[in-house]
Curated annotation (Swiss-Prot):
Belongs to the SfsA family. Transmembrane segments: none annotated. It comes from the Bacteria. This is Sugar fermentation stimulation protein homolog. HAMAP family: SfsA (MF_00095). Pfam families: SfsA (PF03749), SfsA_N (PF17746). CDD domains: SfsA-like_bacterial. It comes from Chromohalobacter salexigens (strain ATCC BAA-138 / DSM 3043 / CIP 106854 / NCIMB 13768 / 1H11). GO terms for molecular function: DNA binding.
Amino acid sequence: MQYTELVPGTLIRRYKRFLADVALASGDVVVAHCPNTGSMRAVDVPGCRVWLSPSRNPARKLAWTWELIELPMPDAPPALVSVHTGRANALVAQALQEARIPELAGYDTHKREVRVADARLDFRLSTAHAAAYVEVKQVTLREHDGHGYFPDSVSERGRRHLEALAARVAEGDRAVLLFCVAHTGIDAVAPAAHLDPAYAETLRRVAAQGVEVLAYGMSATWTHDGVPGDIALTRALPVSLERRLASATPLSD
């Protein structure tokens, strides 16, 4: 997925979930839309460099959207993190189209936002004789042990999606939970039992019932001017359903 224009700034604060104050290089402070309803635990770090996309729509209330943040990493360059949850499905759609996820290759059609019973799942992949349902979850929380965890707060909606996937398996379809790891510093994923034990337990149960769990990590390319130019899912990552964090203290609060 390619960005057409990004402007750097420094995060001052995020507030009211959907708003962020950002200082631009000019010294101006702007209010940007924060397209992330989650807790953004260990990601909402004041003082870090962020990247904003501008809107050319004069009718829009906020002219800026917060897209990315660079987070410090121990003994490594900063990690790039996509905070825009709406980009996760776009990254997965591109990866499916380009056959970058071998486990989900070979399907003729990719339909998005599919209603099943009382839930909506992100993708239905199909051939003439088989179907696979895929639910995408964006992972941005990197805890102090170096692993990525989902969810970053209690998620009843996430549990409902797991039950919907299990119901598809019971009907004879294939069902997949796909973690879209939008943090270049994460190399493995686990359910966040320290934040939402019910979600972790539900995930282990539905996995035992046949729901597949995959994780793919984001990579980024940069322009000659030092601006993020493209992000894509390129890295298959291991998932440990039994892992438990010894301490719930993240790299940053």
